[in-house]
Every structure is written in C-alpha cells, then in structure tokens.
Regions:
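Short conserved micro-motifs on helix faces and helix-strand junctions that flank
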Residues: 23, 84-86, 109, 175, ...
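Hydrophobic helical membrane-anchoring modules
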Residues: 2-17, 157, 194-324
C-alpha cells in the first residue's frame, strides 16, 4: 500500500493542529522519557490544540523500534511511526517526517533529551497567536564538552561567514514551521540539502527563542565528525560562491606573481647577462602550482558530484513500514 493510500485512512479524523517530528537513531534509552515529557509538558497543556507525534526510525539497529511500538500501544491515536529501510541520515529522516505530517504546523525536536520540550508551548503561541511562520530555538549555551562546543562554534561560524549571515551563533535544529513554510520545504527537491539553510532562505517572518542545550544523559551522539564535515560542505558548496571565488582570486594572484617573476628574470638577464640557475626555484613553482591545480580539481569534482546527485532525482529516503 502506498503512502497516500495509508494517509487516506485518517480522512475521518480531525486534522491535527501541530505535528511533532522526532528522528530516531539508536535512541532506545531515551524514547519513553521523551514521550512522557511531550505528553505532560506540551500535549496536555495546549487546550483547543490537537497534536500528533511522528517518530521516524532511521534504520536503528538497537531496540528503538520495539520501544516505539510500546509507546504507540500507550498512545494509539496520538503516535505514528515511520520506519525507513536503512539509515539515510538525520536530514532525510526529518524530510520523511515533513512528508507525513498532517498538522497545520510541524515542530522538529531530537530524541536525545537535550532540548527542553516545554519551549514548544512558546513556539505554538508564536505561530498561532503572533502569526510567525517560522520559530527557531537558538542555542545560547551548551552543557557539553569543550571539544563539542569548539567544533560547533567553528561549524556554525563558518556557515555564518560563508553562506548564511543570519545563521544563529550556536546554530539550531529545534524549530517550528507553519504549513506555508512546510509546503515550500516539501517542494524543494534538493539532493544534498542543508536543512537550516533552506529554512533561513525561505524568508518568512521568523521568531528566535534562546535556550541552553542540556547535557546528554542517555546514550551517545551518532553525529560524528565525518558527518559534520560532509554537512558543512553541503552548506558551503550548495549556498555560497566563496569556494569558486577564492580559487579564481588565487589563480589571478599566482598569474601576477608569475608575470612579475618573469620580469625580474628578464631584467636580470639584460643587466647581468645571466639567468637563474638550479632546480630549487623550478621545483617550488611546480609543487605549488601542482598542488593548487589538484585542489581546484577536487573542488570542481565536489560541485560535479552534487550536480550529478541532483539530476538523478533519487529519493532521499525509502519507507519500509508506517505504523498508523
């Protein structure tokens, strides 16, 4: 049965006012606590607003799915589970949640317990009362290790300098999108999306709410340095002309240096009747220019690979099963 047919089964139910999307990857130890916090601090506190919770199992190999099914048995009409065939990455999991959300707005929060669920009450008020299409919770502080703080500051600092000047200093992955903004996100079929960049690019009225990200109590992060680096490249190469521009300026600089060096050699030959001898100057020039050429080819290759990925129109995820 396809996804649309499965969704039609909800035609006789009231459309939720908001959908909470939670990507899950090796989070077996924190899922019950997350759902309990959502139920007591958000779902039961917003009279007149009906919500739904969508968990996306992104190919977890632990007992996350079993825990989710147990949670659903306790909240059969409130919880939905989207199981992907394998691990497609957090961004793809969030996009799967977007596609299956039925609410008038959608809130994305992690399953690790580091983001305070009670902020959703302020987010919902900002959207339904103040009319903001986008509400972003920004990390003004982090109860994390020095290394994680440093890498995060470097990551989002580069994004702020090179691609998105409106990127909050601490970045974000806890946010609300109104239905207009969500539909725009769904219509974007970018192959290697930088999710935060897409949200900022939309340009809708946005409210920022600051908070301190809590220390992780259960489990460990699967957001490795390699994944961060790949995501950083997606954000820079997909939304900034800086890499190509810096290569162009570097090429121009070395061309000018080569021209002036040729003039110096010519003057030396005219005045002294001798040319510069030896392998050292030649090898320096060859190695420097060769390295720059390889660097430039690598950069072009990154752009070409992303272009190839885009024209394939490959699905960002594959749904294995939907537990409605």
């Amino acid at each position: 049965m396809n996804d649309s047919a499965k969704l039609n089964g909800h035609a006789n139910l009231r459309i939720p006012d908001f959908s909470i999307v939670i990507p899950v990857y090796f989070n077996e130890g924190s899922l019950f606590a997350t759902m309990d916090a959502l139920n007591t601090q958000v779902l039961s506190r917003n009279d007149g607003l009906q919500g739904e919770v969508i968990f996306i199992d992104d190919g977890s190999k632990d007992q996350s799915l079993s825990e989710l099914l147990a949670i659903k048995s306790n909240f059969p009409h409130l919880v939905r589970i989207i199981k992907l065939t394998r691990n497609f990455g957090q961004v793809s999991a969030v996009r799967a949640g977007f596609a299956h959300a039925r609410g008038r707005c959608v809130i994305v929060i992690s399953a690790d317990g580091q983001d305070p669920p009670e902020l959703m009450n302020n987010m919902l008020h900002s959207h339904f009362t103040e009319g903001n299409q986008i509400v972003i919770c920004t990390r003004e502080g982090r109860e994390e290790s020095v290394f994680r703080k440093l890498t995060s500051d470097i990551f989002y600092g580069l994004m702020r300098k090179l691609s998105f000047h409106s990127m909050p200093d601490g970045g974000f992955d806890y946010f609300l999108l109104g239905r207009w903004a969500l539909d725009e996100m769904l219509s974007n079929d970018e192959a290697n999306p930088f999710l935060q960049g897409q949200i900022l690019w939309l340009g809708y009225d946005t409210k920022f709410i600051g908070y301190t990200r809590r220390e992780r109590k259960i489990g460990q992060s699967r957001w490795t340095f390699g994944k961060k680096l790949t995501y950083l490249l997606d954000g820079i190469l997909g939304y900034s002309y800086f890499p190509i521009r810096i290569v162009s300026f570097t090429g121009l600089l070395f061309a000018l240096l080569g021209f002036f060096y040729a003039v110096v050699v010519l003057i030396n030959w005219i005045v002294n009747g001798s040319l510069v001898q030896g392998w050292t100057p030649l090898m320096i020039v060859i190695l420097v220019l060769g390295g720059l050429q390889l660097l430039t080819l690598g950069l072009i290759g990154e752009y070409l690979w992303r272009t190839l990925d885009q024209v394939k129109h490959r699905k960002p995820y594959v749904v294995d099963h939907i537990y409605d």
